[in-house]
């Protein structure tokens, strides 16, 4: 894999660990739908895994009451366990599978319990310290691409075998 150049203030996703790291960050994470703030925290858990942009898990208590509805379907992560999907419902608008969580995470990832990650491409705005995050390509992965991360990123064309 040919790595993208890393500029000042950037980090390469190719320096992230596998299995992933999961650490609380003081960054301000804001998620908006239909002009409403549905999540706002400075206590998100930032998960970093080789070849993926970071994913931010928001503690459930920092998500607006009543906006999450459990969705059908599930998937599994070899590291974190079985994922539960969530729809976001705001002002009569339903965004299917807008986020996911690990309700019974695997050992080593217990601190993700009760936190929800949002797909930045499915909500109206996903902000990291005020910067709009771009979605990770491909639709399955939920990484948040900001100016501080360099790729290339899994999910882009030709990355299926990574």
Question: What is each of the regions a protein language model found here?
Answer:
Residues 1-162:
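Terminal leader/tail segments of proteins
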């Amino acid at each position: 894999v040919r790595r993208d150049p890393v500029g000042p203030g950037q980090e390469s996703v190719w320096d992230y660990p596998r299995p992933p790291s999961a650490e609380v960050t003081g960054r301000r994470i804001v998620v908006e739908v239909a002009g409403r703030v549905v999540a706002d925290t400075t206590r998100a858990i930032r998960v970093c895994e080789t070849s993926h942009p970071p994913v931010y898990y928001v503690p459930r208590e920092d998500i607006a009451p009543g906006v999450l509805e459990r969705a059908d379907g599930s998937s599994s992560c070899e590291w974190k366990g079985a994922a539960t999907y969530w729809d976001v419902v705001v002002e009569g608008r339903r965004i299917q599978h807008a986020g996911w969580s690990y309700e019974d995470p695997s050992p080593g990832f217990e601190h993700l319990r009760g936190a929800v990650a949002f797909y930045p491409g499915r909500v109206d705005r996903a902000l990291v310290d005020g910067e709009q995050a771009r979605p990770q390509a491909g639709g399955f992965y939920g990484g948040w691409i900001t100016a501080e991360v360099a790729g290339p990123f899994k999910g882009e064309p030709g990355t299926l075998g990574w």
